[in-house]
Amino acid sequence: MTTTADLAPDQQIARLLPPGFSEYRSVIAFNRDGHLTAAEIRCYLQELVGLLGMTLAASPGIVTGWCEHGLAGWAHITTSGIELMGYPQPDGTEAVTVGINSCRDYDLDAAAALTATTFGVADGHLTTVRTLTLLGSRP
């Protein structure tokens, strides 16, 4: 008998998932001039959710005050969530990450294209990484 202790960490998690359940996580990262605004974040998150065919469980929320000029946004979707974090840099730019987590697969390339268009990111200056894909055992 195989126990989860005999498996690699990603296999351990996959074994614990309900049959047929999957989890997909990815990150989009870029730098931009200036700072994000709450309105920009809300609009972007709503557009991204629609583009990916997801459903909002609640209106996107904004967190402020965790650092000077820093804003974070969270879109609670019915299949998990999407977060956007802005990290102000000493040179006046902002490093931004968008994390997409869902139990349904999604088009990461489409998400990256919307992100580049929305925030004016030049070609070659946006990074995408599919950080985790776990496929639960099938019944």
Model-assigned labels for residue ranges:
Residues 1-139:
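Polybasic/polar functional segments that serve as interface/processing modules
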